[in-house]
From Swiss-Prot:
The lineage of its organism: Archaea, Methanobacteriati, Methanobacteriota, Thermococci, Thermococcales. This is Cell division protein FtsZ 2. Belongs to the FtsZ family. Keywords: Cell cycle, Cell division, Cytoplasm, GTP-binding, Nucleotide-binding, Septation. GO terms for molecular function: GTP binding; GTPase activity. Its main location: cytoplasm.
Amino acid sequence: MVFDKLLEQAGINLDLDGKDMMDSEMLGDVSDLIKIAVIGVGGSGNNTITRLYDLGVQGADLIAMNTDAQHLHYVKAHKKLLLGRSITHGKGSGGDPRVGYRAAEASASEIAEVVKGYDLIFLTAGMGNGTGTGATPVIARIIKETARNNGLPQEPLVISVVTFPFKMEGRVRIEKAKAGIEMLLEYSDTVIIIQNDKLKELVPKLPIQIAFRFADEIIARMVKGIVETIKLPSMVNIDYADIYSVMKGGGPALIGIGESDSNNRAVDAVMEALNNKMLDVEFGSGDKALVHFTVGPDVSLEEITKAMEIVYERLGEKSEIKWGAMIEEDMGKTVRAMVIMTGVKSPQILGNIEPNALTYSSSSIVVPRSKRLTESKVDEIFDSIDPRTSKLKKMKDNSRVNKIFRDLGFYEL
């Protein structure tokens, strides 16, 4: 079965989490050179933080932020921050991105203190609900502003990893997710999007709740792999400069994942990753890629290099590709490959975005920096999307909604 090892490690078939960790002394002074944080925002993001904690990720601080005090209480993290205490009183956002936005703005000074001093920050959240959708773009902006205000020579790299709702979750949630991603793209260097419907295609027998858990596992394993390949001795290391080169200004991104324990396992895993994309795009629409292998102790470097030949062949000679590999004892004979490609186009989710651009025309989806979002603009966007709370009259066409989005530099519905 496809993804047997990943499902097993997620505890879906067998509870084999592989928590053996390398001696912390092996980190040496390297851990002080590059400071990394993973921030989970909202319920989905918090679940990923707990999973990373259980996996024993080394080399990164795990930070949970939420408007829901009860959920936050049960999260396993190194640091926790309750957002918008005076606004939600710890009772959550009620699925309203406007509340999530206000909560993050109200906690701006606390967020700035928490995110200070990091070189690389992963933001993880689910798009389509309240806190993840509304608060995550604010947090991304504060990360960048804090670095500038402190006079740092280089802003931290912000990589956001988000899930996109199942189609069956309804149009309102999907449109909220689109708007959230668009706002997030403004302040993230790269936004990796995992389309939940693709998970169902890849593992069709998964029950819906287990599919959410599987998405958490994919995100957690991806982040863990990148962090530890930077921070720990690996079979083939990826350094921070490699990550920076691929992810800086990368825009929208996809992840593909594959596993194999065949006689040609590394090549087969890469082929599966190139075919099992978590976002509907065509290869060739991106220009940079990061490839990461997680392997058992008996895999040779020759196997990996043969697999990389396939990647170069598929992605093209003009693509900038960085890759690394690390050994995990519990992988056994299995090779897992993850391919992250930046600067991709996905009309289904992202409209007519031009990858790697900093500003966009009126038909694009990202708010130009000169039109920074304000509370009233956020209200207008989400009032237009959600008919239950809209200040606008329900109309037969989308002309009014489209005007709002055009004025802000967003996509048209």
